[in-house]
């Protein structure tokens, strides 16, 4: 066996020497080969009895062509092309943002529009940048909802600014993945400093700041507020489970977990509910006061009730600036209760948190000193592109102990002196998000950012004033920041019609919410450079659409009355009754009541049952956005028309059903009803037996025998 291995190594050595000789000969043809050099050495030295191969000269380096110099299309884009196309793209971005008001706010397309426009297979050969950009404008842009449009007033702002775009370009060019300090030291350290800067800007207590001397607090940038809510819930769950395992070492963890219960208000973001679902803990959704705020007494009573049931309260998620109406839970009441009961208090200020850089808004977070964690989204209201959600914790060790996974290949020699942000969230890979926060804060300054926030609040107040001055509208929320919730004075159906008409026009975009079981329309100031003119134009669009809705509703009522009269007349004619429709209905109802002794109850349709259940559940659950931007019914006229046609068909079917029921009732009241057979004249009222059977079942009458 040893002999075989030695022979193999000898053969391998000979092969390597031969390959070295060939390479040297191909690079330097004039230089003598290894065998020639060996022969020369033998003739000049009589003492050499054997031929000794010379050591290969390894200073000869093959000249490898730089692939970046390759000018063929296989490289995707050369450096010179990138310079050219990069400048063209910057020009395109500037032109797009300058002229965005000329575009529809929402696209006039239907779901699946792109599938038939893009080939089903990827191209085998490279395509030019010009071709790709042409298709981008022709195929992609028609399907874009323009969040930077001056009349985009849905949801909350999507932060955007030129400094942030440039910072993202640099981050993408660097292309680092900063899961640890060693993976990219500058990324980790800049994030640490930016969380300290921003925390001071919004007035967080020093216990939360990363650079507080001898402090336990810390900050991290997550991908979204949803992730912030989730990781804080996991940290709170880990903390309480650790204590429960010590107190009840022989109880199964699954049983302990089933006893945990968290709390939030009905106006809290849906991500709290999702976090509890994933975390496998119960969630109790609490009622709010008349201003849609969670109060301390409500929480205290819920905690006591659940403890009486054997449950273990452990987590409370509060909101400063709710999604539906920008209301503020009362932290000064909730905080002491959480401290008294040793509950983890989390504060979600995704939208409003950026406004706390203005001192006049900081009283809204009185009680923050009781919180264990806090998050806000600069990518909403601080001119920073998505994604950038900042989160702080009072004790960073309670967060990281719930998330630490430390395989060998991720360890490094500086772990005891640095922060590894991979232990602060769900993903391992992390982007250089702090770079855009640094660029924006430096290039706007705190003064510039404060001016931006205050201008949005002023414009929201202006819209509130315009709507209050119009007798057709009412304001539903307390306008504190940049969100106005309003509705037409009337029923929910009118307001739904108004919103559908507004979004279908493509001139403005808003979304609804449900407040106090009422359908309301949300108007949020979103554009960076929004002006008084933009607000006035938005109000005029709303006012004009309202006039059309009111006019159409009056016409619809008149038309509906005419249709009912015609239907009754047709029914009378079919039944050969000479009385008026009103008298006919009265006589029929009286006779039916006398015969059966009970009133016939109209059976609810499937749609009506679902609507009733939704209405009942809405009073118990948190408010939600009824329709999202992905719902084409909000803005697509084609689908709106299709739905209207479907409703018309349903009305026609309902009318036919009612006529059939009336015929059945009338037929059942005739004296000779029992003497008639299915094939007799009594069956002449029905087109077929199925109609008669359905009518009999729905009216509760027996089929004639």
UniProtKB/Swiss-Prot annotation:
PANTHER family: GROUP II PYRIDOXAL-5-PHOSPHATE DECARBOXYLASE, MIP05841P
Gene3D superfamilies hit by this protein: Aspartate Aminotransferase, domain 1 (3.90.1150.10), dopa decarboxylase, N-terminal domain (1.20.1340.10), Type I PLP-dependent aspartate aminotransferase-like (Major domain) (3.40.640.10)
Coiled coil (residue ranges): 554-620
SUPFAM superfamilies tied to this protein: PLP-dependent transferases
Region span, Disordered: 22-81, 667-687
Protein name: Tyrosine decarboxylase
Comp. bias intervals (Polar residues): 22-32, 667-678
Source organism of this protein record: Caenorhabditis elegans
